[in-house]
């Protein structure tokens, strides 16, 4: 322990003697450690951290593979009847439970509020072993027996605190959920947010209340509708693999049962074969399940790798500084060795300096990381739920930073410590620092470190170029919509107010008429499904006169739109007509008799070739059923999900023929600045019915930016990392060349005394810069080629081994190297030969 304190005192004295060195080293390390800490803060919360429940390692997620032969409402979804089969008959699980996330409108005395809701099975809390903070939570006996018979609500702890100010008398209070009276029965325990590490529901309701929560979409008994997500807790003795194996026989029994249903009995042999090839998947859910994780985890791992490269550049830079500093301290070290200090003791002192530098860098890096993490979070889109990801570092992040700091201190400190204590005592005590024998060895070490920095910087610059070009390509891919910066979109959910079917339609048409009559509005329309949100709903089609080939993709994306949709969106109608008042269906029979559709050009070309599709008929399903939908128009192609997904075949149907209309997405093309219209549009909806909330108001351009948030996150940080690495490499290169010029002052003076022109001296130094640059690039280019293949899935419109990106990275490094090398080269060429020959 005394030796430790001695090393610390020695290091602190050394730092005080050279504050500039200390500041530069700490800042370099802070940038590297801070970058890693910022990315790790999100990665840990989103990907690595276990759920805060008892024995999370025993939780699994269950879902069947495709094809479903029906409606699929999201990834890893299961039908509710299949969930019930698993819950009653699966032997590998203590309990099987399910949930589904959506949004509802809650009515209070002073207005309405749009909140996130999680529908859960009655055994949800029991299976997760989560209790109440106050009141009670759901139970199978009290909340999972009667269809539409459990109008109960459990508040999340966060929502209880933020909305009800932790009022304990809230239990027993009645609230309106989608205009339906329900009772608050409890508040879930603090610290429990749910199964999604990124978002938390505000309230939870029993899944038997689905007809209230999603009016018009009552499919609790529908096997062809996959919507809830199913989880389970393993029995002791079962693993994920053994549970998966034990569930396969039961799953195939369920498939045999489903195949007998009337809706599936007409399957062709091809589809029947695919149907029975389905498997049931069982995977660990110890960290929960998150769509946000699915979307951003790959990006975060890529960024973590790039942050690691930044840390290596920082370490190389600081190691180079330490080696240069060791040369100036060789006489001091030689004296200490001469009077009896052991080499191990001196190495311990020098390593302590490195560790203290890295710990100081980690402390500053933690401060920088919180600021950087907030910047990262600002790039993530709002989803309407309560965001759980935090920028503030917690104990896990703190431990990570300390571990990185210690590893970093040893990484960049060991080689300089070995180099500094390997001293020729006689030469060191006799000569001045500038003429020490160790200078040549030190220069070689520093040159190697600079070459490593060049190679690493090249990797980061190539990554920055690839990701920046990907974002540019995606943003400049034509959406098919005209002037999206002038197109305002917002969502209204009249169905949540439990309007009758005709009233929902008339409400939206009333709003549409008022919006169109507003000054500053050029055109307006609404649709059932939003565009450029990164998701959509596709369905198997049957087409008149087209015999599908085995394995042919017969899917098309569908949407229900109002009249005037094409004008509002700026999409051309290539043939036929728009929808109008004739295209409605107040009853299912009327809707089928008058069913019409407009298809996009891609659909028309695929199924009809050069023939006109106008007047032809299409239908839903695989092999049977009527072709009752008449095509009345063809629209130009436009994107549905987003640029990365490309153009799909699309079928548009009249919104007035939606079987169960609920929410609608409005699109308003404005002549004025869009932001000026926001309050006006909200007021218009409120004038029609103030109890119906408006949310998600933004321009379509902003929506596209949110859809590209993953690409923007990677590109932004890649550019920052690339620039940072280049600056650090430039500083390292400048330091090495300044060191070399100082060490070769006598040689340069002798050359000039013998008649060498200044240009020759200038070239002498710049040539060495080019050698360092060339060797670094020679190492970096093949590494960049290999590593870029691992991020190919994140690229768009640019090849992983894109030549022009590599050329641009080389040009940037060459320019930076020339500038960094020119200053010491110019100083060398300006040396006075007489002064140089006297230099020691």
Regions found by a protein language model. Give the residues of each.
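Mid-to-C-terminal secondary-structure elements
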Residues: 103, 117-141, 150-298, 374-378, ...
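Small-residue-rich transmembrane alpha-helices
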Residues: 39-42, 319, 355-428, 466-470, ...
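Membrane-proximal juxtamembrane linkers immediately C-terminal to transmembrane helices
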Residues: 39-65, 90-92, 131, 197-199, ...
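Alpha-helical transmembrane segments of integral membrane proteins
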Residues: 1-22, 288-292, 321-348, 352, ...
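Alpha-helical transmembrane segments
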Residues: 31-60, 64-65, 372-382, 456-485, ...
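Short, strongly hydrophobic transmembrane alpha-helices
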Residues: 18-46, 50, 314-315, 358-362, ...
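Membrane-helix entry/capping segments
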Residues: 1-24, 53, 69, 75, ...
């Amino acid at each position: 322990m005394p030796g430790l304190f001695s090393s610390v005192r020695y290091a602190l004295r050394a730092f005080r003697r050279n504050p500039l060195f200390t500041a530069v080293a700490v800042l370099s390390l802070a940038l590297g450690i801070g970058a890693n800490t910022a990315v790790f803060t999100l990665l840990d919360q989103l990907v690595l951290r276990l759920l805060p429940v008892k024995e999370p390692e025993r939780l699994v997620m269950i879902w069947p593979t495709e094809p479903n032969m029906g409606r699929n409402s999201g990834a890893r979804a299961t039908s509710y009847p299949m969930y019930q089969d698993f819950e009653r008959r699966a032997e590998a699980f203590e309990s099987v439970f399910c949930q589904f996330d959506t949004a509802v409108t809650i009515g209070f005395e002073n207005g309405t509020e749009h909140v996130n809701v999680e529908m859960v099975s009655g055994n949800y809390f029991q299976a997760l072993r989560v209790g109440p903070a106050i009141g009670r939570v759901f139970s199978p006996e009290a909340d999972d027996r009667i269809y539409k018979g459990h109008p109960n609500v459990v508040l999340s702890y966060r929502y209880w605190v933020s909305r009800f100010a932790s009022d304990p008398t809230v239990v027993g209070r009645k609230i309106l959920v989608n205009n339906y009276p329900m009772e608050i029965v409890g508040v879930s325990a603090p610290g429990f947010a749910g199964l999604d590490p990124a978002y938390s529901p505000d309230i939870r309701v029993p899944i038997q209340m689905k007809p209230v929560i999603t009016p018009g979409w009552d499919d609790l008994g529908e096997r062809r509708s996959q919507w809830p997500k199913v989880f389970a807790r393993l029995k002791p003795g079962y693993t994920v693999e053994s549970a998966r194996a034990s569930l396969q026989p039961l799953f195939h029994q369920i498939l045999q049962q489903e195949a007998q249903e009337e809706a599936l009995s007409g399957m062709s042999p091809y589809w029947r074969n695919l149907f029975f090839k389905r498997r049931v998947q069982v995977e660990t859910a110890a960290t929960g399940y998150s769509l946000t994780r699915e979307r951003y985890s790959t990006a975060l791992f890529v960024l973590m790798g790039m942050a690691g490269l930044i840390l290596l550049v920082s370490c190389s830079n600081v190691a180079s500084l330490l080696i240069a500093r060791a040369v100036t301290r060789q006489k001091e070290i030689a004296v200490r060795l001469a009077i009896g200090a052991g080499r191990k003791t001196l190495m311990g002192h020098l390593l302590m300096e490195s560790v203290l530098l890295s710990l100081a860098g980690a402390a500053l890096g933690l401060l920088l990381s919180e600021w950087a993490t907030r910047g990262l979070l600002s790039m993530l889109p709002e989803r309407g739920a309560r965001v759980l990801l935090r920028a503030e570092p917690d104990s896990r992040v703190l431990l990570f930073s300390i571990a990185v700091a210690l590893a970093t201190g040893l990484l960049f400190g060991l080689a300089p410590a070995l180099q500094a204590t390997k001293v020729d005592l006689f030469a060191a005590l006799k000569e001045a620092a500038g003429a020490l024998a160790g200078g040549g060895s030190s220069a070689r070490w520093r040159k190697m470190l600079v070459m490593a920095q060049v190679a690493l910087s090249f990797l980061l610059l190539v990554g920055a170029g690839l990701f920046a070009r990907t974002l540019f390509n995606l943003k400049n891919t034509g959406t098919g919509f005209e002037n999206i910066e002038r197109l305002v979109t917002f969502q209204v959910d009249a169905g949540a107010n439990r309007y009758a079917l005709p009233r929902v339609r008339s409400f939206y048409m009333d709003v549409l008429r008022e919006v169109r009559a507003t000054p500053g509005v050029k055109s307006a329309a609404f649709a059932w499904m939003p565009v450029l949100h990164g998701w959509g709903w596709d369905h198997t089609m049957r087409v008149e006169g087209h015999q599908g080939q085995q394995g042919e993709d017969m899917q098309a994306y569908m949407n229900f739109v109002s009249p005037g949709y094409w004008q509002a969106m700026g999409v051309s109608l290539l043939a036929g007509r728009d929808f109008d008042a004739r295209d409605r269906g107040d009853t299912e029979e009327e809707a089928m008799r008058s069913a019409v559709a407009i298809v996009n050009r891609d659909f028309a070309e695929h199924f009809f070739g050069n023939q006109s599709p106008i007047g032809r008929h299409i239908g839903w399903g695989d092999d049977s059923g009527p072709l009752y939908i008449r095509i009345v128009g063809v629209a130009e192609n436009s994107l549905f999900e987003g640029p990365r997904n490309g153009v799909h075949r699309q079928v548009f149907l009249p919104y007035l023929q939606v079987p169960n209309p609920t929410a609608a997405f409005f699109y308003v093309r404005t002549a004025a600045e869009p932001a000026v219209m926001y309050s006006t549009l909200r007021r218009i909806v409120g004038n029609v019915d103030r109890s119906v909330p408006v949310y998600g108001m933004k321009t379509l351009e902003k929506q596209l930016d949110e859809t590209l948030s993953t690409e923007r996150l990677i590109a932004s940080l890649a550019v920052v990392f690339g620039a940072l690495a280049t600056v650090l490499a430039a500083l390292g290169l400048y330091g090495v060349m300044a060191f070399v010029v100082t060490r070769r002052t006598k040689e340069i003076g002798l050359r000039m005394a013998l008649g060498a022109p200044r240009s020759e001296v200038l070239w002498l130094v710049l040539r060495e810069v080019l050698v360092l640059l060339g060797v670094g690039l020679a190492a970096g280019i093949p590494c960049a080629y290999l590593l870029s293949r691992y991020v190919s899935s994140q690229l768009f419109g640019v090849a992983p081994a894109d030549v022009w990106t590599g050329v641009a990275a080389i040009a940037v490094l060459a320019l930076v190297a020339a500038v960094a090398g020119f200053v010491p080269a110019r100083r060398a060429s300006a040396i006075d030969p007489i002064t140089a020959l006297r230099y020691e």
